């Protein structure tokens, strides 16, 4: 049975709340089964190295990988999409490619190192685009320099996708995917808030310790009168 994986959210090396797509989480889901897979992508991108790891996993997967873009595959997410045996895009989805970015501090030597590093990262990204599209490296470099946004038809025209998704006929008795991987930041936040709220809802029981301690005012007056007499 073909499996379906959902790659939704920002791509990162690590995740505090499992709300990002990480290579480790993706690998765990990818390796739990066998056979052909469909990967739905809706991601704004993220870490280039993490995306490269996921790309390599899909390229090395021994069965067919159908990538379907149902929202956006931008930046690093577009690199992952290139690993598909077939890439399909929704009529209302978008793809975006651009130059890699980083933050650097230091003197001119450090800045030059950062520039050279970005150049190498760009070359590695172009490798993935070139394999899929067949476009020249110069053309791909120009598209990245311009931060190119592509609708479904443009993505197919340039070779980043193979076809536009058509309306699928889904049988009523169709079973849910054998394995699904959904990273939803909203779901994680809501779950965390529910747990916090539950821990705050306490119903303290009344015990004898909760009763006021000490002597009454009347008893104090009686002792005071005795002292006066």
What kind of feature is each model-predicted range?
Residues 1-68, 72-76, 83-96, 101-229:
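N-terminal organellar transit peptides
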């Amino acid at each position: 049975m073909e499996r379906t994986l959902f790659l939704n959210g920002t791509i990162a090396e690590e995740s505090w709340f499992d709300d990002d797509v990480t290579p480790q989480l993706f690998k765990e889901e990818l390796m739990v089964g066998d056979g052909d897979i469909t990967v739905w992508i809706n991601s704004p991108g993220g870490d280039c190295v993490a995306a490269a790891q996921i790309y390599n996993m899909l390229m090395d997967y021994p069965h067919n990988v159908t990538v379907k873009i149902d929202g956006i595959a931008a930046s690093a997410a577009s690199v992952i999409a290139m690993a598909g045996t077939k890439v399909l895009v929704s009529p209302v989805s978008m793809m975006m490619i651009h130059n890699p970015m980083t933050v650097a501090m230091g003197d001119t030597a450090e800045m030059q190192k950062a520039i050279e590093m970005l150049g190498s990262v760009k070359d590695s990204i172009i490798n993935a685009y070139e394999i899929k599209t067949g476009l020249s490296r110069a053309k791909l470099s120009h598209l990245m320099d311009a931060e190119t946004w592509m609708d479904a038809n443009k993505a197919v025209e340039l070779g980043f996708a193979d076809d536009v998704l058509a309306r699928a006929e889904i049988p009523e008795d169709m079973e849910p995917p054998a394995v699904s991987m959904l990273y939803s930041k909203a779901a994680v936040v809501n779950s965390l808030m529910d747990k916090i709220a539950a821990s705050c809802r306490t119903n303290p029981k009344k015990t004898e310790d909760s009763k006021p301690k000490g002597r009454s005012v009347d008893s104090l007056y009686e002792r005071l009168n005795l002292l006066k007499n």
